[in-house]
């Protein structure tokens, strides 16, 4: 394989040697923007912009600057969480510290993210796949030498080294050695909770899926119908999620050099069901540059609008997602939750009224044990309240989790009729209460309840009275649990919903003054995506507010005020952390105490979580330190200066830039 890829690269070099890039004319813009990387072998790399419906007209062409000497840009993609363009630089001739993650501005300026890493991607820089997994905010990197990595877009480091790319044992092409050079995920939008990874096996001109992605298992979809395996060809794949239609559309760029040193750059659409490629137009008008990589833009607002209604926190996959109660289609943020026991799944989420902090319940259904966590709403970091999981027989079904505001205890109920109280201070079981049972004489007295959600009224620290409402998923009815400790259920009415088999249903009640507003989230749609509803606690009737995001399966919610929760943060590693001046005009100084010698970096992000700058302060000695950031050229607004010691979060300060 090594000899083949080296030969392929040499052929590509020979075909383009001596060619210079031409200036490209601009054209009219249209709905969906895409980006590409073009290059010649004189070392000129350019970022081009075009519309998918008019690929022949590049609306912008700018040189790429800032790449480390010896590296080539081998991949670009848009980060779904922020809409930022990222790029991977790779030096095929180096064996260590040969790769660097960058953000790529539309001006063509590359900004390093973290430090260089070592990626064994082989010697063929034309066969490297690079794409964001939208469900976990990690970057998949694949290569023609069967390499399979994940990168962290926050630190630039290697998140995991995964299994080599190999066809599944039962696949019709199981005996073949793949030559993957392009990768792309479906459902590329913030808040995505389901995705599929597709690759182009360029060695055999076919579309494949990579399932499971981390195992590197390839599954044949079908032939492209066009060749991608010539030594004089370079292909790339990206998949655009259309928020209007709710559909995924796959695009492939294919650059082919001729023996006469002219280049044909073609855009194709790809049928994800069959693999068939259909020509969609020429890419640009130049015939002496090659189109290396393709990335469809993902639109995120330049600044988020004011919250409408309340701020809702939701558990979607392994992420903490936030959205507005009056506008759930706008996902404000999605952060990965870290620090949870690997044997547990988060099954409950609520705001503790006494502290305005976010709490969650981690549960191991096999061991029937649980841990109470606090969740940092800004970073997703979970901190265990009880160091050792407690025995909690909640079965294998759905679980309800909510704070009783009058006694500062957590009510935990299960579809198996379990009924517990937990102490939020130490995570212990405060009481094992009566099994959930419909009251004698109730309309459902003959039925066995299957409760999967619970919520108390008057969720404020000063509450002296409250009521507990629960949701029976088997009958889709709302019930009052009264008395709560006896587990007696009293039917109030049907919701008119039918949850899917996954039964991702939860409810929460927000209190403002003397008014309680109940919300319910359910995946009643046939596609499994969740919808937010308001809930009438008198009769169980639901009124849809809207679909959450572009389509997310949300299993738990917690409703907070518009300002959000206070959060429970880990102690900062940096002592005496301070920012001055603030507001900032020009140079901002961050002073802190360093407890031990460490490499210090500072990442600057905007209000949308986009990385706008990285300051590498180098190795610093223990003691007082200062790191400076120049805000010149940054738009006025809110920024977050995030310190890291030896790549570990050390503290954050918020800055307001005035110009």
Where are these regions (language model features)?
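C-terminal tail/sorting-segment detector
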Residues: 614, 627-628, 633-659
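Sec/Tat signal peptide C-region and signal peptidase I cleavage site
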Residues: 26-31
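Short, glycine-anchored, charge-dense loop/turn motifs used at functional sites
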Residues: 604-612, 639
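Short coil/turn segments that connect the beta-strands within blades of beta-propeller domains
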Residues: 32, 83, 135-137, 194-195, ...
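Beta-propeller fold detector
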Residues: 58-68, 108-119, 158-171, 209-227, ...
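Structural motif
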Residues: 42-49, 94-103, 147-151, 205-211, ...
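Repeated scaffold domains used in trafficking and secretory/extracellular systems
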Residues: 69-77, 118-132, 168-188, 229-239, ...
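Residue-level detector of functionally pivotal "anchor" positions at catalytic/ligand-binding pockets or at interdomain
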Residues: 562-580, 593-595, 612
């Amino acid at each position: 394989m090594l000899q083949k890829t080296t030969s392929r690269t040499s052929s590509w070099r020979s075909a383009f040697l001596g060619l210079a890039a031409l200036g490209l004319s601009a054209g009219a813009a249209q709905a969906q923007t895409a980006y590409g990387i073009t290059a010649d072998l004189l070392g000129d790399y350019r970022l081009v912009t075009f519309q998918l419906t008019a690929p022949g007209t590049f609306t912008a062409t700018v040189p790429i600057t800032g790449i480390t000497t010896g590296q080539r840009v081998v991949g670009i993609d848009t980060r779904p969480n922020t809409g930022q363009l990222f790029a991977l630089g790779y030096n095929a001739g180096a064996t260590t510290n040969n790769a660097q993650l960058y953000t790529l501005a539309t001006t063509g300026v590359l900004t390093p993210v973290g430090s260089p890493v070592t990626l064994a991607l082989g010697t063929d820089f034309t066969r490297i796949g690079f794409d964001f997994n939208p469900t976990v905010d990690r970057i998949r990197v694949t290569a023609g030498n069967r390499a399979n990595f994940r990168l962290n877009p926050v630190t630039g480091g290697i998140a995991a080294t995964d299994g080599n790319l190999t066809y599944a044992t039962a696949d019709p092409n199981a005996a073949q050695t793949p030559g993957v050079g392009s990768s792309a995920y479906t459902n590329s939008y913030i808040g995505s909770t389901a995705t599929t990874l597709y690759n182009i096996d360029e060695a055999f001109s076919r579309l494949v899926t990579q399932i499971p992605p981390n195992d590197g298992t390839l599954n044949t979809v079908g032939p492209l119908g066009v060749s991608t395996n010539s030594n004089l060809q370079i292909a790339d794949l990206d998949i655009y999620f259309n928020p209007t239609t709710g559909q995924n559309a796959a695009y492939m760029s294919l650059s082919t050099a001729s023996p006469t040193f002219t280049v044909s750059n073609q855009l194709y659409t790809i049928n994800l069901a069959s693999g068939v490629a259909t020509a969609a137009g020429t890419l640009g008008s130049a015939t002496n540059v090659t189109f290396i990589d393709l990335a469809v833009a993902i639109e995120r607002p330049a600044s988020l609008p004011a919250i409408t209604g309340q701020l809702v926190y939701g558990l979607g996959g392994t992420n903490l997602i936030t959205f507005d109660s009056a506008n759930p289609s706008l996902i404000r943020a999605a952060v990965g939750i870290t620090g949870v026991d690997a044997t547990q799944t988060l099954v409950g989420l609520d705001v503790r009224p006494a502290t305005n902090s976010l709490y969650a319940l981690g549960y191991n259904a096999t061991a029937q044990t649980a841990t109470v966590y606090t969740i940092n709403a800004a970073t997703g970091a979970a901190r265990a309240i009880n160091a050792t999981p407690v025995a909690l027989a909640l079965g294998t079904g759905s679980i309800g989790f909510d704070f009783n505001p009058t006694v500062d205890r957590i009510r935990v109920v299960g579809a198996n009729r379990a009924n517990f109280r937990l102490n939020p201070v130490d995570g212990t079981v405060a009481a094992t209460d009566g099994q959930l049972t419909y009251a004698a004489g109730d309309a459902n007295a003959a039925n066995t309840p299957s409760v999967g959600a619970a919520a108390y009224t008057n969720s404020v620290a000063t509450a002296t009275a409250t009521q507990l409402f629960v949701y029976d998923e088997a009958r889709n009815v709302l019930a009052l649990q009264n008395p709560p400790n006896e587990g007696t259920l009293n039917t109030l009415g049907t919701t008119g919903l039918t949850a899917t088999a996954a039964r991702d249903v939860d409810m929460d009640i927000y209190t403002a003054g003397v008014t309680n507003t109940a919300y319910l989230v359910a995946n009643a749609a046939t596609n499994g995506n969740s919808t937010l509803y308001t809930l009438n606690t008198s009769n169980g009737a639901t009124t849809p507010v809207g679909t959450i995001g572009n389509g997310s399966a949300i299993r738990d919610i917690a409703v907070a005020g518009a300002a959000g929760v206070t959060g429970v943060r880990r102690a900062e590693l940096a002592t005496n952390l301070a920012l001055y001046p603030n507001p900032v005009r020009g140079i901002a100084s961050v002073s802190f105490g360093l407890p031990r010698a460490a490499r210090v970096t500072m990442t600057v992000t905007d209000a949308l979580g986009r990385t706008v700058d990285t300051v590498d302060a180098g190795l610093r000695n223990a003691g007082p330190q200062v790191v400076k950031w120049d805000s010149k050229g940054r738009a006025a607004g809110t920024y977050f200066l995030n310190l890291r010691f030896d790549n570990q979060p050390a503290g954050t300060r918020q800055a307001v830039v005035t110009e």
